[in-house]
Amino acid sequence: MDSTGQDNSSSPNPPVPAAQAVPTFGDRVHDFEAHLPTLNQALSSIASFVPGFAGYKTSEDRRIADKQLRAVIGERLSKVKDRLDRVVDSLSRAGTLDGLALVDQSGRRLERLIDRMRFADYGYAAVFDRVQMGDAELARIYQYDAAIMGELGKFEDAMIEVEQGTTDGAHLRSALVKLDALTAEFDRRFEGRKHLFDGLPTP
């Protein structure tokens, strides 16, 4: 205490919080896998989109299940393409030629995606048949495929906008941009399936 009567003794420093450990790559992988659905949950999720889904447990099942998955996707997208073809017919009959070429371009992009669903890439199929997958890997691809299937409803929503835009050129162009973006993104996501097998052992 000084001559003024004030206590100049230093107050204790506030406690320093302990430094938080930076999670390692292994910690992050463990956290990701901890949030994966169980194998049965993941299988049920995709089976809700693909009736009679065989699953990917064995090589024979994989060939069947992959074909089932592609068939359902192709069928859903073909229905969207049929609606797009009817829009082309409607514009042609009405003599509305401004948007006709754009609709036709969108249809051809969608047709290429449908063809890809119908015909599996040989190199991808060979890897898919042979790669060894445990329950965690199976759950991961089931979850991924279920997410892909969940995107198909967006195509149907986009087609409603296209159909509503047939009398408004600006609306039609905007709707087609959205449809084209969906087509490109779905193609990219489906292409990404093959990377789920990167680093997995083969016999």
Task: Annotate each language-model stretch with its function.
Residues D82-A175:
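Charged linear interaction tracts used for macromolecular binding and regulation
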Residues G165-P203:
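Preference for long, well-ordered alpha-helical segments
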Residues R62, S92, Y122-A125, E191-K194, ...:
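Structured alpha-helical bundle/scaffold domains in large eukaryotic membrane-trafficking regulators
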